[in-house]
């Protein structure tokens, strides 16, 4: 996206950084090289997955998802594979999400692709969660959307000072999927609700402090960490954890820096404890602090339908298993593909680039409980199955 497009987006969001992170999440390619877009290699004691589209921030395609799932299952059964490592090529991104533009373009030409991508991606997310081998995600750089899905459900997630986490889907008429309804409400207090509704980004050690990552390692030591993991001889889960803990303990970058949201957490927990988006908005308005008004401004730019879907998704997901959440999210994904706001969000940000989505409905009060029920209803025989 050119400078002019960036400037237009800056006027729609309250900070360049938040705008840039959403743009990075949404930038997609119009072509892929299926043979090279993901590398699957046996190295030492490990199976290594490299998301290999650095020019496009390692965004996921359906072909990549299929290759990763098939190899994951093979390595899980291979007695010579003791752990699985997933990482992104290049230094900018682990994985900035899924092929959003391709999804929108498939609306009128390839309905099966809309079903297949979400179904197979969610099945992969669940397979990572249930993987019998230690699964280590090196989430250096941008990690959003689909990138979160192929990392956060793994046993170990290693952040660096360059890690950037965000779930900005409400800005384009979607919801934080790939199991967001499971892991977000399980973060401390109401942090996950805040992240889901605002698209707020976490960077560096904050990704670890928030609980997205299990370990923090200085970027300059990340290559050595990988080498030491690969050199292990028939390691147990405990051996792997010991190596990660050793590197974590030696990593001092921003060690004494407070969590970016630390001073606001009590208020976040209060504001986002409300059972409706309308009440959350009222809470922010009544507070009136600069931080509250900043978040209010962001929320008012989001799709009203997406906001309501997301709040209900997290509330229901807080008491569901991951497979149950993914079944729910598959229903939501298919409803969003048939709805207005996702395609309008893609149009405004990626196609016409006017950065002025016209949401329908345009106001929270116009999104009724009946509307929401339609998004969450069962698909019958078409429901996601594992």
Curated annotation (Swiss-Prot):
This protein's transit peptide sits at 1-32
One of the record's GO cellular component terms = mitochondrion
A Gene Ontology biological process term: valine catabolic process
Q: Which Pfam families match?
A: ECH_2 (PF16113)
Annotated coiled-coil segments of the chain: none
Q: Which cell locations does it reside in?
A: Mitochondrion
Sequence intervals crossing the membrane? none
- Reactions performed catalytically: 3-hydroxy-2-methylpropanoyl-CoA + H2O = 3-hydroxy-2-methylpropanoate + CoA + H(+)
Q: What is its EC number?
A: 3.1.2.4
GO MF annotation list:
3-hydroxyisobutyryl-CoA hydrolase activity
Tell me where in this chain the PTM N6-succinyllysine is found.
92, 221, 250, 257, 297, 301, 353, 377
Where, per the database record, does this protein carry Phosphoserine? 234, 356
- What does the UniProt keyword field contain? Acetylation, Branched-chain amino acid catabolism, Hydrolase, Mitochondrion, Phosphoprotein, Transit peptide
Identify the residues that bind substrate: 121, 146, 169, 177
Q: What is this protein called?
A: 3-hydroxyisobutyryl-CoA hydrolase, mitochondrial
> Which source organism does the UniProt entry give?
Bos taurus (Bovine)
**What broad taxonomic lineage does this protein's source fall under?**
Eukaryota, Metazoa, Chordata, Craniata, Vertebrata
């Amino acid at each position: 996206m050119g400078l002019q497009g960036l400037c237009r987006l800056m006027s729609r969001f309250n900070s360049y950084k938040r705008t840039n992170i959403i743009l990075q999440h949404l930038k997609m390619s119009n072509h892929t090289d299926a043979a090279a877009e993901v590398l699957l290699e046996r190295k030492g004691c490990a199976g290594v997955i490299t998301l290999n589209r650095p020019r496009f921030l390692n965004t996921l395609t359906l072909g990549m998802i299929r290759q990763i799932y098939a190899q994951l299952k093979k390595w899980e059964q291979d007695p010579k594979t003791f752990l699985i490592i997933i990482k992104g090529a290049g230094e900018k991104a682990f994985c900035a999400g899924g092929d959003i533009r391709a999804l929108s373009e498939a609306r009128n030409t390839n309905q099966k692709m809309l079903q297949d991508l979400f179904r197979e991606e969610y099945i992969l997310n669940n397979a990572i969660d249930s993987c019998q081998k230690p699964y280590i995600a090196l989430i250096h750089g941008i990690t959003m959307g689909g990138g979160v899905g192929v990392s956060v459900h793994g046993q170990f997630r290693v952040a660096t000072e360059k890690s950037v986490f965000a779930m900005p889907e409400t800005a384009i008429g979607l919801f934080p999927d790939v199991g967001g309804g499971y892991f977000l409400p399980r973060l401390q207090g109401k942090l996950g609700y805040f992240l889901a509704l605002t698209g707020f980004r976490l960077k560096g050690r904050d990704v670890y402090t928030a609980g997205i990552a299990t370990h923090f390692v200085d970027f300059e030591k990340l290559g050595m960490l990988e080498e030491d993991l690969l050199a292990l001889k028939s390691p147990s889960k405990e051996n792997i954890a010991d190596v990660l803990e050793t590197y974590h303990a030696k990593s001092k970058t921003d060690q004494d820096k407070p969590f970016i949201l630390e001073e606001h957490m009590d208020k976040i927990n209060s504001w986002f404890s409300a059972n409706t988006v309308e009440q959350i908005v009222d809470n922010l308005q009544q507070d009136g602090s600069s931080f509250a008004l900043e978040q209010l401004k962001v929320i008012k730019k989001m799709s009203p339908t997406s906001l309501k879907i997301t709040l209900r998704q997290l509330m229901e997901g807080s008491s569901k298993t991951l497979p149950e959440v993914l079944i729910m999210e598959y229903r939501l994904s298919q409803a969003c593909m048939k709805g207005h706001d996702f395609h309008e969000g893609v149009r405004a940000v990626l196609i016409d680039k006017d950065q002025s989505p016209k949401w329908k409905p345009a106001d929270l009060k116009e999104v009724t409980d009946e509307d929401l029920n339609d998004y969450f209803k069962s698909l019958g025989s078409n429901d996601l199955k594992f």
